[in-house]
Structures are given as C-alpha cells and as structure tokens.
Amino acid sequence: MEIAFDLSTIFTDNIQRLTRTDLLKYGPKRYWAVAQSIDCLGEMSSKFHGWKRVITMYDKIVDHDEEQTTYIMWEKVNGSKSILKGLLRVGYKTLYLTDNEQNQYMEKAMCILDFFVVPTEQRSGNGFKMFDEMLKAENVTVDQCAFDKPSAALQQFLEKYYDRKDLVWQSNKYALCSNFFIGRHPTVPFTPRQTKRASRASSAVSSHASSRNTSPIGRNRPRHDSVADLMRQDMLAGVRAEVDPNSPTGLKNARDFGHRRIW
C-alpha cells in the first residue's frame, strides 16, 4: 500500500516501534502520515480478518487506558512516497486463564491484539520479520504471548515459524501456546468433583447407616421380649414365698380367701 509521504523524515527503522508517547509526539496536525498509516492498515486488517469493526485506529490507541505499542513495517520508494507493508499492535493485559488440566490463573501477559501484513507483501517473510522484531524489542518469547482471536492464518504462521500447533483456547477468546503455563503457579488449582450419581449413592449409604445406629426412634422403641424371657418370668411367678399365718399378710390372706390357702 502506497502513501504519499516520505516516512523516512519521521521513522528511523523499517520496522518502526511506536509507543503512545511517540504517537502523541507525532500528532496528526503536523505528522498526518503517522495517523493515516495506522488508520489505513487498521481498516485493511479488519476487512482481511472479517471483523465487523475497525479495532486499530490512531485515536483509540492514544486514548486507551492501557499502554499499547504499535509496529509499522514500511519502505521508502522514489520521491516523497512510502510503501506500507504491515502492522502489529501489542500490549500487556491481565487475563484470567485456564490450562488443559483446568487449573486457573490470573496472569499479566503480552497480548497480540492485531497482526496484519498487506496481501501483496505476504509470502515474503515480512510477517516473521515484524513479529520476531517485536519479540526482541519487548523481550518476550512466543510462549509468553496471548493471542486475541487468532485467525487461521495466524495459527498457520505460528506452526510454520515457531512449531506451535495446539493452542489452548480460553473463554475470553484468547489463545495461548501450551508452554505458556510452564513454571507458573495456578491461582485456583483444579479439584476433582464427585459425579451427581456417586454423590447420591454415598449420601444414601451414610443416611442408612446413621438411621440404624443413631436414630432416636430406634433408641426409644419399646423392647420386645423373647419367648424364653416370657417363659422364665412365668416360672418365677409360680414360686411364692411362704407367709406366716399369724403375720399381717397371713391374716389378710386368711380373711380374703376364706381362711384357707388357695396356693
């Protein structure tokens, strides 16, 4: 993509690193080409990825609460013109993440927010040059990066140049290399849970054992005597103590039972 401005009057590198401070210094009133380069590349990136809105714009970057860094790949041509080849926007974000073992993390990661190479400049190694320059400048590795909604093209790029095949997808639409979690300690380690069926079975067994051993109903229930106990009681009832006829009890018995013993 060609722009009618000699970027060599502003930029010092063919892969120019621009912080928010740099972008504020190169304001659109005096350096309109900087804002226009970012806006044009951002619009092309959104169309290429099929996004509904443009996510990379000069105004959004300088007004954003979080610090972001933009890389522009360009080349000077004859006269006062330049060719724009690609754009890469990155920034640190605090993310809630989960690994393949369901351990949970809260990590501040370098996020790849927008990565685009102009179609006519693709298949020439420009994407790798720009991405590798970013890794060196930010002092990170590809395994330390989190990718925001990585496209199929970006996944192929990671596999081709960095041998990263299986990304770990997150509920927030970010994706990471599996090596991202090596050496990191989970905020919430995964704890296996019982299935509902196993939980119900365990509860039923516990309830049955408790009712047999500790139920108040079982403790207060009337005792049922055995047949042997009843026979023993009858035998004991047949044995009566001898009473002196002249004692009060003997006199009472004589009066009540016609002056004769009935047993």
UniProtKB/Swiss-Prot annotation:
Biased amino acid composition, Low complexity: 200-212
Enzyme class name: transferase
InterPro entries per UniProt: Atat, GNAT_ATAT
Stored Pfam families: Acetyltransf_16 (PF05301)
Reactions performed catalytically: L-lysyl-[alpha-tubulin] + acetyl-CoA = N(6)-acetyl-L-lysyl-[alpha-tubulin] + CoA + H(+)
Example of a GO cellular component annotation carried by this entry: microtubule
Xref: Gene3D superfamilies: 3.40.630.30
Disrupted gene: phenotype observed: Mutants move more slowly off food than wild-type animals, but retain the ability to slow when encountering a bacterial lawn. Mutants exhibit significantly reduced nose touch sensation and are partially insensitive to body touch.
Key word Coiled coil present: no
GO biological process, one term: thigmotaxis
Documented EC number(s): 2.3.1.108
Tissue and organ distribution: Expressed in touch receptor neurons and in a subset of ciliated neurons, including PDE, ADE, CEP, and OLQ neurons.
Annotated binding of acetyl-CoA, by residue: 115-128
Region of interest called Disordered, as start-end residue ranges on this chain: 191-223, 242-263
GO MF: L-lysine N-acetyltransferase activity, acting on acetyl phosphate as donor; tubulin N-acetyltransferase activity
Domain N-acetyltransferase: 1-181
Biased composition (Basic and acidic residues): 253-263
Key words of the record: Acyltransferase, Transferase
Domain of life the protein comes from: Eukaryota
HAMAP family recorded: mec17
Task of the protein: Specifically acetylates 'Lys-40' in alpha-tubulin/mec-12 on the lumenal side of microtubules. Promotes microtubule destabilization and accelerates microtubule dynamics; this activity may be independent of acetylation activity. Acetylates alpha-tubulin with a slow enzymatic rate, due to a catalytic site that is not optimized for acetyl transfer. Enters the microtubule through each end and diffuses quickly throughout the lumen of microtubules.
Similarity comment text for this entry: Belongs to the acetyltransferase ATAT1 family.
Name of this protein: Alpha-tubulin N-acetyltransferase 2
Organism from which the protein derives: Caenorhabditis elegans
